Amino acid sequence: MKIIRVGTYKTGFKYYKNKVEITNADEIEKIRLLKIPPAYENVTILNNKKIIAFGYDSKNRKQVLYHPSFIAKQNAKKYNKMSASINFFTKLKRKVATDLKNGRTGAGDEKTFAIAVIITLILTCGFRIGNKKYEKDNNSVGLTTLKYKHLKFEDKKVLIDFIGKKGVRNVATCDDRIIYEYLYEAVATAAAKATATATATATDYVFTYDNGKVITSNDVNEYLKVASRKFAKSSDIYITTKDLRTWNANTLFLTYYKKIRKIRDRERLKRGEAGQASDNANDANDARDADKYMKGIHKDIKKAIEMVADKLHNTYSICKKSYIDPKIIEGVIDSRQ
């Protein structure tokens, strides 16, 4: 049953079901417990198994509040999909590396080369794929809507700087030689065309092929879909750019965590603490040391997630809630290393 919320935080809210105001105190309290952001306007409350409510923020962007159980199920599917495709990602990186090399030497086609560059930037710089609809509706940029004005070149490195999803500034430097050469040549070619035709290039899209056809998010996902058929364990599993970001987040988490632990182990050795640097909590001298050791592990987990969030241009809470597989965190805690 749909319930409409009317009013503002300052004036107070009223709720209507079938155009009749809800006055029952218990029912109103149940609605309040749903914790719908007071700043949302034109709120419709569904409270079904999937969606609690939806409304619009100050920029008139639709915001959906999903039911926690639905989010949990979707996350479980996402992480199970990732686990089932773990070998795929390794093979995909090899394929992308080959397509980059072929593109650079002229052995590959222009479209595949552009897509390989995009996927590399997703993995190395943490950018989202983006699409024209999101650019139009929210004035935000992703890789497929990247423009020449977002690029700066210096010392064989390219600085990419744009406003992405939810108004978050995305800044990253890429020093990959092939990526640098691809983007530098793209800018030079566009500038030459602009000079010849007296048109501006700053607002032109970077990733194009066949004389101006723009690479879309669908093109990149189709590339991944075809690769999925070849490399994934199951033909029913299709990897998308979202899956790529999830896999990248978890890979980065483990990499960062291991680096942090190595630093902590070296510090323990310098302090001359009892036991080897690799000793686990069960080897600690007493319960006090074990508790201190475990607190250190949780602190390092948090730090690793913060580093992943920064890499993916996300907040800590979003990264932990939507990107890092809880089973991986549990595994790290259980291993006590």
Placement of each model-derived feature along the sequence:
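A positively charged, amphipathic N-terminal helix/segment that binds anionic biomolecules
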Residues: M1-G142, L146-A191, A200-W247, T251-R266, ...
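Compositionally biased low-complexity segments enriched in polar/charged residues
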Residues: A192-T201, R266-A290
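Catalytic-site neighborhood detector that most strongly recognizes the C-terminal catalytic loop/helix
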Residues: D291, S322-Q337
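The DNA-contacting recognition helix of HTH DNA-binding domains
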Residues: T315-Y316, P326
